[in-house]
Swiss-Prot record:
Disulfide bonds: none annotated. Keywords: Cytoplasm, Methyltransferase, rRNA processing, S-adenosyl-L-methionine, Transferase. One of its GO terms (cellular component) is cytoplasm. This is Ribosomal RNA large subunit methyltransferase H. GO terms for molecular function: rRNA (pseudouridine-N3-)-methyltransferase activity.
Length: 156
């Protein structure tokens, strides 16, 4: 199974790139973590945010390979603790589909992305900066994998 993070935004700060790479490189070959960056729409004083979200959503959904499970990150989504995420990872593996996790930009996800989702996951009730979410996602997914593989990374 491949896990794909589809995230709005390019040109992230160096610490974001390094943090993401640190965890993504640890994934086993049979479960690679791939990042697909979607160019963010231009935001300014008179920007049409609805139109920007629509365009970003179209680009995100176009990046999802046919047949992939779509999981959106959204505050009202289901909350999983680490063990529940590990269980979810196992369920995804049994489903025999690759997984695309959609991470929105500053205003969140387009309605079309939410409508296309097979699942919606709330990473936190807090509003997190979208660059930070990439690092948190990579670490959380790696930790969940480590539990399923009985790897010593996760300690209770």
């Amino acid at each position: 199974m491949k896990i794909q993070l589809i995230a709005v935004g390019t040109k992230m700060p160096k610490w974001v790139e390094e943090g993401y790479k640190e965890y993504s490189r640890r994934f086993p070959k049979d479960m690679p973590l791939e990042l697909v960056e979607i160019t963010a729409g231009k935001r300014g004083k008179n920007a049409d945010i609805t139109r920007i979200l629509q365009k970003e959503g179209e680009a995100m959904l176009a990046a999802v390979p046919k047949g992939n499970r779509i999981v959106t990150l959204d505050i009202p989504g289901k909350r999983w603790d680490t063990e529940q995420l590990a269980e979810q990872l196992e369920a995804w593996k049994l489903d025999a589909r690759d997984v695309s996790i959609l991470i929105g930009g500053p205003e969140g996800l387009a309605p079309a992305c939410k409508a296309a989702a097979d699942q919606s996951w709330s990473l936190s009730p807090l509003t997190l900066p979208h660059p930070l979410v990439r690092v948190v996602m990579a670490e959380s997914l790696y930790r969940a994998w480590s539990i399923t593989a009985n790897h010593p990374y996760h300690r209770e």
